[in-house]
Amino acid sequence: MKPSLEDTLLASIRTIPDYPKPGILFRDITTLLGNARAFRRAIDELVHPYAGQKVDKIAGIEARGFILGGAVAHQLSAGFVPIRKKGKLPFDTVRVAYSLEYGLDEMEMHKDGVAPGEKVILVDDLIATGGTAEAAVKLLRQIGADILAACFVIDLPDLGGRAKLEALGVPVRTLIGFEGH
């Protein structure tokens, strides 16, 4: 019998205590990415609700969102658009500032990465507080994207990121939640 999605993900996501600082349980998806069956299953599950729908672009947040988003884009026959930290893209960009734990940062994308009205799915590995994903949503809306959903492998529900995106009217899809961060 095929293991459940939850069992597959639990067996292939490594938890590292006290990284990057004491008290944090870091959820490492590199072990998921290195397991061909688990990686394929995660991508298939992320894609499933959108198969047959018109999806123009997948926007992936640096860095693990590039890996997952590229695979999702391939499966949906959609283009891929990187959302990066400021100063990393070589052409004309649009930029948005967002709050970090200790200050501000900025992310950007190419101005011509998404045309107004194009249907976009935002992809990243994990949603925690939602600050980065919220900034990505604002960036995509700034250039006129129609955001169909935001998809993540992991949700840390105690940190409220999902609710933050849903309050912005963005449907959120996650594959597994870890209570307690």
Swiss-Prot record:
It is found in: Cytoplasm. GO terms for biological process: adenine salvage; AMP salvage; purine ribonucleoside salvage. Keywords: Cytoplasm, Glycosyltransferase, Purine salvage, Transferase. The keyword Cytoplasm applies. NCBIfam families: apt, PRK02304.1-3, PRK02304.1-5. Homodimer. This is Adenine phosphoribosyltransferase.
